[in-house]
Amino acid sequence: MSKTSRANKYVYFFGGGKADGNESMKNLLGGKGANLAEMAGHPNLRLPVPPGFTVTTEVCTYYYQNKRTYPSVLKTQVQEAISKMEKLTGKKFGDVKNPLLVSIRSGARKSMPGMMETILNAGLTEQTIKGLIEQSGDERFAYDAYRRLIMMYADVVMEKAAGVEPKGGKGIRKVLDEKLEKVKHEKGYASDTDLTAADLKALVKDFKATVKKVLGTEVHDNPNEQLL
């Protein structure tokens, strides 16, 4: 790889028995990203690591050195990585019949237990959930995945990353958790697993309205806007 291409490379792909990086690249890929690359690409391990990609630590550095903006090529590189994932999984990001969903996990050069954030099921929307229900045959599973996305996205992206100060010291995650607990109490449920598909569908609707009321904006219903 040339110096120019390496300097402009911000996304490292792994999957299909191959990986752009390895375990020696923790400064660039973070501990989690480097280890995933090693597991996915090591010829002797042959571990069934699902395809994915790592956005390098250099993007974080760039962001803070350039007035909170991203490298101009980052969006294209992420889209190229998503295309590779689609080819390997047979699913398509944003597709209404067979949607590809992704987990977004933060990482760092050094281990920071309890400090990292996660967003699950990015790519779920009012339209793509229909495909997840069709593919899984489980409406309850699909709406449980959707309500988890809304809770995580509102907390991590719309509040914390946006620098929004929680009203009354109560963050959006706490507000949504209380709504979830209220439904469980009213229905006499002992755990989240007792919630029915109808319960979760109603919670999703309530969560969306609550996020808009508390944070003043809606959860993105476009897969690409969720991701980028």
PLM segments and residue spans:
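Nucleotide/phosphate-binding sheet-loop regions of phosphoryl- and nucleotidyl-transfer enzymes
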Residues: M1-L228
